[in-house]
Amino acid sequence: MKKLFTMVGIGLALAISGCSSLTGSKLVSAEGLEKAKKLLEKDPYTGKAFTKVMLWAGQPLEENFESVTAQYFDQKQGKDVSQTASEAGLSSPDVSSDEPSKAETFTLAEIPFDKVPAQVDNMIKFLSSQSELEEMEGYIVHSLIFTKENGQIKQKYEIQCTKKGEGKSVEGRNIVTNYYQFHVTPTPDGQYEVSEW
């Protein structure tokens, strides 16, 4: 009997750990942000001054961290380069044919990863309290963009949500869920600017 309980316990532990690896780390959780940071600490990003850093989730209505894209000026080529990294590997660099960006640059150390989870919690509370958005539910952060303006790091969040009561529909073999998306930018005074996608 004791062996049976031990086997059941081991099986349960394996099932729980297996399921947790399937769910992944939320994009704006401490674990998801740490994954992004670790990717940005590796080549080709090491020591780079970025003009934009973007964190991405997977498919629409997913919020688990999938990849990070960084834009930076490449001295050798004299061009802006954009490159995406994920745990699966690194994409080929996308070299811009335009003139180099005049955007302010920033380093990895300047990105306020530690402030993001609390900022997102406050932002979701703010969105939930808005009368214009009372029909919406299930807010998730699908992407996060860091830039620098006037010497300050700015974040722009892509929020996705569903409408109460819409549910899902079936079209052939596909299950369809309508979703809505918009951007939210925190302001220096603690408010939020909401803009259309």
Model region roles, listed by residue range:
Residues 1-4:
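Positively charged n-region of N-terminal signal peptides that target proteins for export
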Residues 6-12:
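Sec-dependent N-terminal signal peptides
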Residues 15-18:
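C-terminal motif of bacterial Sec signal peptides marking the signal peptidase cleavage site
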Residues 20-22:
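Bacterial signal peptide processing site
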Residues 26-31, 38-63, 125-153:
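Short glycine-rich, low-complexity/disordered patches
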Residues 47-80, 144-179:
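Exposed beta-strand-loop-beta-strand "reactive/processing" segments of non-cytosolic proteins
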Residues 78-100, 168-197:
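A short, surface-exposed beta-strand/turn
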Residues 91-139:
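Long, charged/polar, surface-exposed segments that mediate recognition or autoinhibition
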